[in-house]
Amino acid sequence: YRYKNPCCTTDTVVFSYKDEQALKEGRLKVLLVKRGNHPSIGCWALPGGFVNLRENLEDTARRELQEETGVSGLPVEQFACYGDYQRDPRARIITSAYLSIVKESDVSVEAGDDAADAAWFEIEMEPETAYEEDGWEKTEYHLTIQNQDQKRNAVILKKERTGLVREKYYVVKEGGGIAV
């Protein structure tokens, strides 16, 4: 076979809410794991990992979530695919992203597998600057994740072109201890 094959991974974004009022107001937390291996060792990241050869993507998302956080049995929905060839220093990686939402008191989180820790973080993303350049609408966002033990900040650039076909890209300008 003459084509090199990329690696496939899944990541799962799990949001939690304290009660119905918090859900209505959009006060959510996100479940993150502290990476125990390279790349980005010691940084906080979404739970995820590599797809086994004979494994469906959704099964990978569920397996990695359970292995890294102890959380299982959640409904998951695929919402995006990321494939920038330079996004991972290890190899050419294509990631299918999944989403779930749960009442925080319904799950117990415990780090496992290659995760050094797992925890809920409050999230806040505020637009800092917005401008147009070369036909793109660009907005820089200040992303903050925090819990009772720590706080991390990142700067994300969103590039968007609207029309019949919308193009949207995200660029991490400053990671700040968040593996992205």
Language model segments and positions:
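N-terminal strand-loop-strand
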Residues: 1-45, 58, 73
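Unchanged
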Residues: 51-180
